[in-house]
Structures are given as C-alpha cells and as structure tokens.
Amino acid sequence: MRAGGEGAVFWLEAGVYRMQQIEPLEGQTILGASGAVLNGSRLLTEFTEVDGHWVAEGQTQQGVRHETDESAEGAQRPGYPDAVYVNDQPLTPVDSLDQLRSGTYFFDYDADRIFLGDDPHGQTVEAAVSPFAIASGANGVTVSGLTVEKYATPTQEAAISGNGEGWVISNNEVRLNYGVGINIGGNGQILDNHVHDNGQMGLNAGGGGILIEGNEIASNGFWSGIDVLWEGGGGKFTETDGLMVRNNYSHDNNGYGLWTDIDNVNTTYEGNRIEYNSAGGINHEISYSASIHDNSFVGNGGNGLTWLWGSAIQVQNSQDVEIFNNFIDASSGGNGIGLIQQDRGEGAFGDYVTVNNSVHDNTLILTSEGGVGAVADYDEERMLAGGNSFDNNVYHVSEGGEDQFAFGDYYTFENFGAVVGQDLGSSLLIG
C-alpha cells in the first residue's frame, strides 16, 4: 500500500488471499474481481488422533480478548476470537478437553494444540488467525467487490474497519468473522453489502454524516458467546449525528435488527425491512432526536419477552422521536411500539428521558398479548407528563377487550383513549 502512495487504486484478481492485513493510505481504493476473497484463517490439514480426538499441532495464534465477562448464557470462552471452522461452519469452543463433543473444539493454548470433537478427514478445516482484513485511520478510502471472511476480529472490532473519515464500503460480502463485520467513522458510507453470520454483530458505526444503505444484514450474533443484549445482532450505531439508515434488509439476527445506542442525534431510519430478529426490530436507546418512518417489521422480538421489551420499534430513554408510516406485523408474537423509561442518567444533550415522542399513522398487527404504549420503572410521572403521544394508528388484533395498551398502567383500547387521552384518532380492527 505504501508503494502505491496516497490515492492509488489496487485490483485483486479472483483467488483466496489468506491472513492478509491491509492498512490503506489516504484516498486509496481497493477493488476485487468476482471471486476475490480475503480470508483471515489458516487451513488445518494435518491431524493426529489422540484418545478419540483429532489434534492439530503448532497453533500459536492467540487473539486479543475483550469483554470476556459479557457472556451469553451457557457460553464458554466468550471474547476468545480464535475461531475454528469446518466446511464454513464455526465450531463451538469449550474450555476443557473433557467437555469436547461433536461440533466443538478445545484450544489448548499452553500446548499450542487444537482438539476437534469430530473426524476432520475429508473436511475443510480452518482456524482464524489474523485480527483484521482492512483497517486504518486514513481518510477517503474505498473498499468494494471483496469477500472478507474468517478473521479473528476481537469483540467490538471489525474485519473492515474505517477509522478515518469518508470511507465508502460497498458491494462486499462480509461473513464469518468473530467480532464485527464492518465499522466506519464520520461521513462514511456502508452501501449494498451482504453482511452475514458474523459472530458478534454485523455493522458498527460512529460519527457525523454516516449513511447505511442497501445492505442485507443477516444471521449475525449467534456464535461469539457474547451477550447480544450487551452488544450484538444486526448493527449498532453510537455517538452519531445525522445518521441515515435507509433501505436495508436486516433479518434473522440474534439481538436487535438495528440499534442506536448512546448519544445519537438527528437519526433517520427510513424504508428498512426488519424481520425475525430475536430481541426486537429497531431500538433507539439513550439517545435524542430521530425519525423512524416507512419501515416494515415482521416477526421481531418473539414470545416470552415481558413488559414492552422486544418491541418492533423500541424507544428507550430517548426523546424527540417521531415514529410514523411504519407497518408492523407482530402476529407471531412480540410487542408493537414501546416507549420505555428507566434510570439511565444523562448524556451529551441532556437527561436520558422518554419524552416528546410522537407515534402516529402506523399500522400494527398484534396478538392479544402484544403490547403498545409507554411504561416506566423510574420517574413515571415525568414520562406520563412529558408530551408522549399516540394518534391516528390502525391496530389489527386477534381479540378485543384486552389490556394491551400501556400508559403507565395497561388499558383496553377504549380506555387508552377515554382515560389517558391516547390514540383518540386511531382505530382497532378485531379478527
């Protein structure tokens, strides 16, 4: 990269480039032909059988470990990025040899050995080694047309990481990396990528003027062992100003589909498809002004989530959010639109409180258990008097007369209007 100089364009022919780490200079462009793959793993081809297990010797890699205490329930070795794959499927790590079973591996770091629970002969076995594919603090970098896979990216770090201003990351497939797939900073753009099956999370971004558009973000957050409610799922955006998240398809992620968390202001979510994400659809948390409009939601959150958790659209200790013209199908479970207030302190632009939020002109399909409204377990009076409003929405419910509309307490649809004055211009359709 240095030999090319600032502003140079690099072309990668089709082929697999293993364990490469690229640090672009200012204004450089990296383009890939169809079939150009940056692969952060080492092929494992030699195994010996020891006591019914298969062993690869000489494995000296040991990636940086972050947040090993943020474990998903039952996970072993969360935050250990030294993943092992068989036929493009990540195996599950265990922390002792006596727990080794089919579908798992044990990395004995003291002996530089990887033990497998299954016979690897005739299979493609790979071990993640390199911590990133493309990363630097340079400005104005473009990355396009690559497949980027199987990097030992630490928790919260990305295989493609644009730490400078104005990166454009487009038309890549980014998959099977331990931590995050893609990260960008201010005035960066993530466009038309397929970001899937990364261990912790698909996307991450922070800064001003960011555009996230046209991406498919799928099946992330399942195998790093990190608790996705701490951080994981489809994508998470922090300390942004003017963030635009538009026309993305975020689906089947473990965690939220899309998540703005901590001091985001002037955010727009527009025209996104958000489907079948385990924790909920869009969560706007401890942040400020946002517009969430013209999105569609199907099957997010699921059953078993209490209160208004797991809403298709969740506004959590945030203010000045307008939610309108969204379509929400929660007929398979989960909640609709939830405004939630807890004790979260204050941030860059004032208190983290759930006030001045407007929910209008949305269409929702709910079960009799699916909730809508505003709830608090801290300073409820401030939330109730804080200018939050619901109006001109259309609700399709399987049964009438249920207490599924919340404004502090829970009410029937009729009392939601008559008692607390919410959704007076809205309609409820039963059946």
List where the protein language model places each region:
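Extracellular parallel beta-helix/beta-solenoid repeat domains
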Residues: 1-431
